[in-house]
Amino acid sequence: MASQPPFKTNFCSIFGSSFPNSTSESNTNTSTIQTSGIKLPVIDLSHLTSGEEVKRKRCVKQMVAAAKEWGFFQIVNHGIPKDVFEMMLLEEKKLFDQPFSVKVRERFSDLSKNSYRWGNPSATSPAQYSVSEAFHIILSEVSRISDDRNNLRTIVETYVQEIARVAQMICEILGKQVNVSSEYFENIFELENSFLRLNKYHPSVFGSEVFGLVPHTDTSFLTILSQDQIGGLELENNGQWISVKPCLEALTVNIGDMFQALSNGVYQSVRHRVISPANIERMSIAFFVCPYLETEIDCFGYPKKYRRFSFREYKEQSEHDVKETGDKVGLSRFLI
């Protein structure tokens, strides 16, 4: 049985028309252009624990500068064993290789309803359609993964333990530079509301360059991405879309909306997108650091750019905007 979702059939049932010729035509929210690829700042985390103060300070300075200028950076020597990524990728492939009819079943592998997602049910125009599928796994539900996928559950738990350690270190370093105490992040790293998103981007089924993931910012505090070497991630910088060159054995880190608000706009939550590969599949695993729904986000710094709001309020507003317009308006809703 086929594992790939019926993208063409689904698209035509929604829009009843042919797909735009290219992403440059379909991206109605910006007049930006495609540019050649860049290599994001690469930060060696081993310098934080090397015992050499000069290297540690330089590492922190590089991280802060990247978070301010790009909202993205890559990290190497993070201490996560290579086999953890290899085992996680293997389990990810097993999940996506299941027949489509099995993946869409309610409570597949005892994951919560709507954990499996594909296309873009919120799309209000052809420009907002995505040729991808994903498993959205909230960390508080990992222990519920069915016994027939015991290996998946064990490996996800190991992966989360490792990636969360790195995420907490980065959050505390960046937070300290904008006067946020490390205690602020303690409840966040109970990880009840954080989640993994396993992504599979399919080669274009429309005969043109299309989105694997439409332009957006992340709602999280921080996102850490493990990806293959296929490429396709692009970020918006100074009015241009820039393709990001994968760096072997590096993790990609990006600032989310919550950290931009908390830092009073010092750190940048940057719009990014994924272009579907031309003739090969692309896989990635994203870890999103999110607070409890009732966590209050209040800017550190004056004059404050954003009013105080809860994570629940932000999520509900974003979901409403997506339903109404197909796009998340984001932090501009909360400007003072």
Curated annotation (Swiss-Prot):
The active site is at 282. Its EC number is 1.14.11.13. It catalyses: gibberellin A1 + 2-oxoglutarate + O2 = gibberellin A8 + succinate + CO2. Pathway: Plant hormone biosynthesis; gibberellin biosynthesis. Residues 191-291 form the Fe2OG dioxygenase domain. Binds 1 Fe(2+) ion per subunit. Keywords: Dioxygenase, Iron, Metal-binding, Oxidoreductase. Belongs to the iron/ascorbate-dependent oxidoreductase family. GA2OX subfamily. Fe cation binds at residues 216, 218, 272. InterPro entries: DIOX_N (IPR026992), IPNS-like_FE2OG_OXY (IPR044861), IPNS-like_sf (IPR027443), Iron_ascorbate_oxido_reductase (IPR050231), Oxoglu/Fe-dep_dioxygenase_dom (IPR005123). It holds the Pfam family DIOX_N. This is Gibberellin 2-beta-dioxygenase 7. It is an enzyme of class 1 (oxidoreductase). GO terms for molecular function: gibberellin 2-beta-dioxygenase activity; metal ion binding. 2-oxoglutarate binds at residue 282. Its cofactor is Fe(2+). GO terms for biological process: gibberellin biosynthetic process; gibberellin metabolic process; response to salt stress. The lineage of its organism: Eukaryota, Viridiplantae, Streptophyta, Embryophyta, Tracheophyta. It comes from the Eukaryota. Catalyzes the 2-beta-hydroxylation of gibberellins (GA) precursors, rendering them unable to be converted to active GAs. Hydroxylates the C20-GA GA12 and GA53, but is not active on C19-GAs, like GA1, GA4, GA9 and GA20. Induction: Not regulated by auxin. Down-regulated by paclobutrazol. It comes from Arabidopsis thaliana.
